[in-house]
Curated annotation (Swiss-Prot):
This protein's record includes keyword Membrane: yes
Motif mapping: Histidine box-2: 169-173
Compartments where found: Membrane
CC cofactor: Fe(2+)
Organism: Limnanthes douglasii (Douglas' meadowfoam)
Enzyme Commission number(s) of this protein: 1.14.19.10
One cellular component term from this protein's GO annotations in UniProt: endoplasmic reticulum membrane
Reactions catalysed according to its record: eicosanoyl-CoA + 2 Fe(II)-[cytochrome b5] + O2 + 2 H(+) = (5Z)-eicosenoyl-CoA + 2 Fe(III)-[cytochrome b5] + 2 H2O
Pathway(s) it belongs to: Lipid metabolism; monounsaturated fatty acid biosynthesis
Sequence motif Histidine box-3, residues: 302-306
Position of sequence motif Histidine box-1: 132-137
Name the record gives this protein: Icosanoyl-CoA 5-desaturase
Cited Pfam families: FA_desaturase
């Protein structure tokens, strides 16, 4: 009895639904999708294409490489730390502790010799002038003895030997603001500021640990020597500072100096890819930040730098203070810096931002 009742009811119901669907499709243009659910055979008009909403954040808006942007998975602290990461973390903690002692061990000779003089030699002559604008980008040339002396000074900044530093920065420009960037902002502000220093496995993961973009430096015995003996020079400097001025020289020379230079350099990777102006259409996240420029000897004019990577001058306007450029200009005046590269007016007009 149940079966005899079921079949007539189901047949009549399906016929009723089919008739209803045909009626809706032919009489109500606004409801073809509903009709197609009732009867898939009924053709429906394709839905009009809607424009993809513009991304809200700069990370998507300034995609500059074929590499897909991906955010680093959480778990930075819970991951397995390799010995070098642990060593770097302990070193950073010790140096920050020394820097915090600086007010209690202040003396004018420690301030001027360990911080100002040694900071200028390692920070300006070493990192920004030699490592960055000369070795990485070839913005100018120096006599080999002068280049090697400045490179040695840069090694005392504890930011890596010349080959490691230059390799990281060349990769940064090659894969700027993508997951293959050594300190990509796609990984978050903390990571691109200092976290990348504590995650060496990431370099191995992304590039197999290869530094095949510094063959020009690998060919030179001096840079291979600095790479192999890098830590010995740091220990020698500590011994020299202690011999000359005791513990206050250690506090100001190995604590305050290095921490100040660390965060000045790291701010270029983090702050200057987040806050500031973009007068040039570089297609990336680089910005000009005056505060960072003052702390990092002119390196904070980072959008200028990404627009004209080989330019020896980063502060392109008269009011953009660029201490490193003033030193390069002085070296050029006395004949030590040659083949100094600057952007042409044609290059500037090509990259000038519309809003600038």
């Amino acid at each position: 009895l149940r079966l005899s009742l079921y079949f007539p009811i189901s047949i009549s119901l399906s016929l009723s639904l089919e008739a209803m669907a045909s009626f809706i499709a032919t009489t109500t243009p606004a409801m073809p999708a509903f009709a197609s659910v009732l009867d898939p055979k009924i053709p429906t008009k394709p839905e009009p294409k809607t424009e993809t909403p513009k991304p809200k954040d700069d990370l998507e808006r300034f995609r500059t490489s074929e590499v897909v942007l991906e955010r680093k998975a959480k778990g930075f602290w819970r991951r397995k730390w390799n010995p070098r990461d642990i060593q770097n973390a302990v070193t950073l903690l010790v140096l920050h502790a020394l820097a915090a002692m600086a007010p209690f061990y202040f003396s004018w000779d420690a301030f001027w010799i360990s911080f100002i003089l040694l900071g200028f030699a390692s920070g300006v002559l070493g990192i920004t002038l030699c490592f960055h604008r000369c070795l990485t980008h070839g913005g100018f040339k120096l006599p080999k003895l002068v280049e090697y002396f400045f490179a040695y000074c840069g090694s005392l900044a504890l930011q890596g030997d010349p080959m490691e530093w230059v390799s990281n920065h060349r990769y940064h420009h090659q894969f700027v603001d993508t997951e293959r960037d050594v300190h990509s902002p796609t990984q978050g502000f903390w990571f691109c500021h200092i976290g990348w220093v504590l995650d060496k496995d990431l370099f191995v993961e992304k590039r197999g640990g290869r530094r095949n973009n510094v063959n020009d430096l690998k060919k030179q015995a001096f840079y291979r020597f600095l790479q192999k003996t890098y830590m010995y020079h740091q220990l020698a400097l500590i011994a020299l500072l202690y011999y000359v001025g005791g513990f206050p020289y250690i506090v100001w020379g190995m604590g305050f100096r290095l921490v100040f230079m660390f965060h000045s350099t790291f701010a270029i990777n983090s702050v200057c890819h987040k806050w500031g102006g973009r007068p040039w259409n570089t297609g990336d996240l680089s910005t000009n930040n005056m505060f960072v420029a003052l702390c990092a000897f002119g390196e904070g004019w980072h959008n200028n730098h990404h627009a004209f990577e080989q330019s020896a001058r980063h502060g392109l306007e008269w009011w953009e203070i660029d201490v490193t450029w003033y030193v390069i200009r002085t070296l050029q005046a006395i004949g030590l810096a040659t083949n100094v590269k600057l952007p042409t007016e044609a290059q500037k007009q090509k990259l000038k931002a519309k809003s600038a």
